[in-house]
């Protein structure tokens, strides 16, 4: 019969503590890039949907990560990370 391997790794900080630290970092980054009213509305939506639960914390983390990723990917003006936007010709000549 197989046995589970013994836990030989170093102790990690509790998952809940790490999750709350991640949420705090994401919130701090989000307020630099998005209007507070949008973020407040997102928080209200999450609270109304999930209440005060860990599922709500996980949902808002996932949404903030996606928003920030897309924001940086399309070219944030606050950062050098992202795709440089090229000007498109008005006559549509660049289309194939």
Curated annotation (Swiss-Prot):
User: Which intervals of the chain are annotated as region Homooligomerization?
Assistant: 1-42
Please report a single Pfam family linked to this protein. Answer: VPR
Function recorded in the entry: During virus entry, plays a role in the transport of the viral pre-integration (PIC) complex to the host nucleus. This function is crucial for viral infection of non-dividing macrophages. May act directly at the nuclear pore complex, by binding nucleoporins phenylalanine-glycine (FG)-repeat regions.
Q: Impact of changing residue 25 to K on the protein?
A: 75% loss incorporation into virion. Perinuclear localization. Partial loss of cell killing. No effect on human TFIIB binding
The effect annotated for residue 41 to N is: In strain: Clone pNL4-3
Q: Which UniProt keywords apply?
A: Activator, AIDS, Apoptosis, Cell cycle, Host G2/M cell cycle arrest by virus, Host nucleus, Host-virus interaction, Ion channel, Ion transport, Modulation of host cell cycle by virus, Phosphoprotein, Transcription, Transcription regulation, Transport, Viral penetration into host nucleus, Virion, Virus entry into host cell
Segments passing through the bilayer: none
Q: What is the effect of changing residue 34 to I?
A: Partial loss of cell killing and nuclear localization
After translation, how is this protein modified? Phosphorylated on several residues by host. These phosphorylations regulate VPR activity for the nuclear import of the HIV-1 pre-integration complex.
- As given in the record, the signal peptide range reads none
Would you tell me the protein name for this molecule? Answer: Protein Vpr
* Top-level division of the source organism's lineage: Viruses
Q: What is the effect of changing residue 88 to K?
A: Partial loss of G2/M cell cycle arrest
How the protein is affected by changing residue 59 to P?
Answer: Complete loss of G2/M cell cycle arrest
Q: Record's Gene Ontology CC terms?
A: host cell; host cell nucleus; host extracellular space; virion component
Q: At what positions is Phosphoserine found?
A: 79, 94, 96
Variant or mutagenesis effect after changing residue 63 to F: 10% loss incorporation into virion. Perinuclear localization. 31% loss of LTR transactivation
Q: Which GO terms describe its biological process?
A: DNA-templated transcription; monoatomic ion transmembrane transport; protein homooligomerization; regulation of DNA-templated transcription; symbiont entry into host cell; symbiont-mediated activation of host apoptosis; symbiont-mediated arrest of host cell cycle during G2/M transition; viral penetration into host nucleus
Q: What else is known?
A: The infectious clone pNL4-3 is a chimeric provirus that consists of DNA from HIV isolates NY5 (5' half) and BRU (3' half). HIV-1 lineages are divided in three main groups, M (for Major), O (for Outlier), and N (for New, or Non-M, Non-O). The vast majority of strains found worldwide belong to the group M. Group O seems to be endemic to and largely confined to Cameroon and neighboring countries in West Central Africa, where these viruses represent a small minority of HIV-1 strains. The group N is represented by a limited number of isolates from Cameroonian persons. The group M is further subdivided in 9 clades or subtypes (A to D, F to H, J and K).
Mutation: residue 58 to Q; reported impact is: No effect on ion channel activity
> What family classification does the UniProt entry report for this protein?
Belongs to the HIV-1 VPR protein family.
What's the effect of swapping residue 15 to Y?
A: In strain: Clone pNL4-3
């Amino acid at each position: 019969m197989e046995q589970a391997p013994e836990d030989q790794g170093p102790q990690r900080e509790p998952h809940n503590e790490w999750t709350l630290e991640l949420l705090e970092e994401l919130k701090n980054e989000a307020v630099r890039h998005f209007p507070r009213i949008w973020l407040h509305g997102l928080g209200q939506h999450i609270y109304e949907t999930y209440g005060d639960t860990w599922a709500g914390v996980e949902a808002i983390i996932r949404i903030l990560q996606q928003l920030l990723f897309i924001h940086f990917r399309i070219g944030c003006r606050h950062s050098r990370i992202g795709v440089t936007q090229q000007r498109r010709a008005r006559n549509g000549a660049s289309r194939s």
